[in-house]
Regions:
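Short, intrinsically disordered, charge-biased short linear motifs at domain edges
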Residues: 1-4
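ATP-binding/phosphotransfer module of carbohydrate and carboxylate kinases, centering on a glycine-rich
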Residues: 7-10, 15-128
Length: 128
């Protein structure tokens, strides 16, 4: 649970501006439904900005070259992904952000199941 906007909406945890409120699919879909058609790109871009705020220090600390997002492409691709990239570029050194490849995962819903299976295999059988 991470705060990305101190003046943001009240979260179920009692704090304001938590990343979940701007990025979790159910919350993002609700905001898109409530907004007009002209606001949808801005709502998605705002969520992408929040994602970039959360990811930038991690990308810098670990010097990551690749970030792969998994989730509903109709929500994550386009304005959200573009805004996340832009925010990361602003918040990291150019040596880090210039080499960064941030993209959508290919494989859809099965990736979540595969990730869970890998965690089980690793924890229970030592397979990595």
């Amino acid at each position: 649970h991470l705060i990305v906007d101190e003046g943001g909406e009240l979260c179920a945890c009692g704090r304001r501006g938590c990343l979940e409120l701007s990025l979790a699919a159910p919350h993002l879909r609700a905001r898109l439904r409530a907004g007009g058609s002209g606001e949808r790109a801005a709502i998605r871009a705002d969520a992408g900005h929040s994602l970039g705020i959360a990811l930038a220090p991690i990308i810098s600390a670990l010097n990551l070259n690749d970030v792969v997002l998994c989730g509903p492409p109709e929500l994550l691709d386009g304005p959200l992904l573009d805004a996340a990239r832009d925010t990361i570029r602003i918040r990291t050194l150019s040596a880090v952000s210039n080499g960064l490849d941030m993209r959508m995962a290919k494989g859809g819903e099965d990736l979540r199941l595969l990730g869970a299976a890998v965690l089980v295999l690793s924890a229970e059988l030592g397979v990595s």
